[in-house]
Amino acid sequence: MNIAIVTGASSGMGREFVLQLSGYVQVDEIWVIARREAALESLREEVSVPIRPIVLDLCESASFDTVASLLEAEKPNIKLLVNAAGFGKFGAYHKVSLEDERRMIDLNCTALVMMTRLCIPHMAPGSHILELDSLSAFQPVPYITTYAATKSFVLSYSRSMNRELKNKGIRVMAMNPGWVKTEFFNHAFQTNGDGEVQYFNRLYEAKDCVATGLKDLYKTKKDYSVHGLPVKIQVAMVKLVPHRFVMNIWPNQQKKPKNNVGLTTDGK
């Protein structure tokens, strides 16, 4: 049985991957992983491919035992893995709880590595892995410090794994969008959008970012993908300008009048 697996599939970018992936890969079933069962079940009404909801919290280590057992029992051929589960918290380091710090690292880094490692033995040549990353991967970003650091890890891990798996015919690509209109913001703000992070100069649509990511995954040899000319310019800039200067840009932007470009104060 040929399958695709998408984590973080209940909303946002993960859900959009489920909606669009059939344009690039033909599978018998899509395994969708997230915590909210109802949101996963509702995907059955939106795609023609059979959906298998798997309700798991990927911050919990026992979840990977469940995934390993399912893979061992069914022995599917995984054509595509999309690791889209993740979250971030905005604000000065001392305002982010230690529990949120731990969960960011567990979900953004540990879960991504565990899912990748568990799936590779069930992948044949021609299979693909997409690791959802962020523009913040390319430089340190004060006031989203831990989130940005986890995304730097994802970029490095993805590019290295793409090289390691080349001889197996398995392609790995990081996808590095700018800010995207998703539920991410519902949880990222500390309180009602107040605090050190208030200003966003641009938000992209999830469907457009996902379309670019899938196209780059299947139609190019890139090991990371960015969507939108302004984002591409920023990535080029941080390669040329010393990071000690780049790190001042984000805090200086936050001194501008609050402008969440379409977000309400609770991030929606």
Regions found by a protein language model. Give the residues of each.
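Conserved glycine-rich Rossmann-like NAD(P)H-binding loop of the short-chain dehydrogenase/reductase
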Residues: S22-S42
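Substrate-binding pocket helix/loop in short-chain dehydrogenase/reductase
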Residues: A92-H94, D100-R102
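Active-site helix of classical SDR
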Residues: T116, T150
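Conserved NAD(P)H cofactor-binding loop of Rossmann-fold oxidoreductase domains
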Residues: A84-K89
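SDR active-site lid
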Residues: N167-L229
